[in-house]
Amino acid sequence: MTDREAIRRLSVNAGDFSAVSWLHHNNTEVIHGVVAHYFGTGEAADRAECVLMQRIAERARSYERQENPGEWLARCASSECDRLRNEAIHDKANMPMKEAHSHG
């Protein structure tokens, strides 16, 4: 399978586990690099990476055939990590004060 084929399969079925696994395995360095940039390493980064792959699968319909699949994936990963980080900041800001302090 190629990245292009995996993205095409996800555009038809975002739940195609084989296609998600292929993209993750074939683009591990890019994905880990983007996640580390936004979330560092550890538990939060691991959770973010799982959500990131799900969101990339859901965005596969936005892929244009003339696009470079690697560039598309890197762009999606970056924008989705930015979105995830902003969601986490928003959630933490709206958490009750006592609970926010217990989460550090």
Language model segments and positions:
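Short terminal alpha-helical segments
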Residues: 1-14
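Internal acidic/polar
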Residues: 4-5, 83, 91-104
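Short, flexible active-site loop motifs that bind/organize anionic cofactors or intermediates
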Residues: 9-10, 34-35, 59
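A short, charge-rich alpha-helical start-of-domain segment used by transcription regulators
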Residues: 11-33
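Σ70-family region 2.3-2.4 aromatic/basic alpha-helix that recognizes the −10 promoter
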Residues: 28, 46-57, 67-90, 94
